[in-house]
């Protein structure tokens, strides 16, 4: 039975275990920029504004998708008319290799979109390696390609979705 719920600080170890499994299975390791320990400390604290949803099957974390409010990494690549608006990034999209192609990411996207309806956000950002299949899911979710840029030394497509 699958359950989707928000990850808590007690899920941190499971999150990093999933990350390690996903990165190990990737043919192109550039597809995923793993969360750093510092980012995890900020995300998995009790009063964080960030939200990471997890799909659990038999109490095992098999997929994640997060909403991150700290988008300072992107301010220099955003169009000027977005700088004063409230935005967040959708990221940490991972599915365990044994559970891919089962619609888990689509279910996480739907759950996160429901959560986003209750926020004051004006836009969302999403990034993906240009060759990653996730580009199709991002576009299917209504995002528009904004530009190609470098993030932490990795080439990424940056997508944007205006909410209002």
Per-segment meaning from a language model:
Residues 95, 101-114, 140:
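Conserved acetyl-CoA-binding loop-helix of GNAT-fold acetyltransferases
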Residues 17-34:
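Helix-loop element at the rim of GNAT/NAT acetyltransferase active sites that forms part
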Residues 2-17:
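A short beta-loop-alpha structural element at the N-terminal edge
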Residues 150-164:
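C-terminal "cap" of GNAT-fold acetyltransferases
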Residues 118, 130-148:
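Conserved active-site alpha-helix within GNAT-family acetyltransferase domains
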Residues 60-92, 100:
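Conserved acyl-donor/pantetheine-binding loop and adjacent beta-alpha core of acyl/acetyltransferases
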Residues 30-57, 66:
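Active-site rim helix/loop that mediates acceptor-substrate recognition in acyltransferases
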Residues 90, 124-128:
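Conserved hydrophobic beta-strand within the GNAT/NAT acetyltransferase core sheet
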